[in-house]
């Protein structure tokens, strides 16, 4: 449930309704709180260093605690320094600026929420930063930009869907190894 653009009370109400419905049907619920930079081109002209320093848009600890307690969501996507992929058509094929994660903030969010944290905008982040994030509470990492660009680049170069699929498979295996989650399917997927 992405209610991140809603006011806190409205996000809580919407997410709680979805989580209650999902749980009644034995389905887990992921929710989002905070403003991940770069979504649909937003923040493209903002200075990343200033945002990181001030934590503008980062998931607030008090709000995260309240959100997790009241919504009973199973996973919480948090804003901790990552940048959403190049979603807007005009920047679709551009390399993302290199982002980093506020590891201390991740650890604090993990403590106050007590639930697995999700990282949107995981493509292009330094691998050690990702590993540190995992060690401090990140349990799911979205890397859609990396996967999509691999597919589109290979398809554009070869005009062969099967080669593009094979390139995605290879890149996905590389990412799994780099995140050190190889062999964790049961743990990750239940």
Role assignments for model-derived ranges:
Residues 1-113, 127-150, 182:
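Alpha/beta enzyme core
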Residues 116:
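Active-site-adjacent substrate-binding region
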Residues 119-121:
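Thr-Gly-centered strand-to-loop micro-motif
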Residues 125-190:
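C-terminal alpha-helical cap/extension of soluble enzyme domains
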């Amino acid at each position: 449930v992405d209610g991140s653009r809603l006011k806190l009370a409205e996000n809580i109400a919407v997410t709680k309704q979805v989580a209650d419905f999902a749980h009644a049907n034995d389905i887990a619920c992921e929710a989002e709180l905070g403003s991940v930079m770069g979504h649909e081109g937003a923040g493209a002209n903002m200075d990343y260093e200033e945002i990181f320093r001030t934590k503008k848009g980062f998931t607030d600890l008090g709000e995260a605690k309240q959100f997790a307690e009241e919504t009973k969501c199973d996973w919480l996507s948090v804003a901790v320094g990552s940048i959403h992929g190049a979603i807007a058509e005009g920047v679709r094929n551009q390399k993302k600026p290199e982002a980093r994660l506020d590891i201390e903030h991740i650890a604090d969010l993990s403590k106050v929420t007590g639930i697995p944290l999700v990282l949107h905008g995981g493509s292009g982040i330094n691998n050690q930063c990702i590993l540190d994030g995992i060690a401090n509470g990140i349990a799911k990492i979205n890397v859609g930009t990396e996967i999509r660009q691999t597919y589109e680049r290979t398809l554009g170069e070869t005009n062969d869907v099967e080669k593009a699929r094979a390139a995605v498979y290879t890149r996905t295996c590389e990412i799994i190894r780099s995140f050190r989650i190889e062999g964790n399917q049961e743990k990750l997927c239940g």
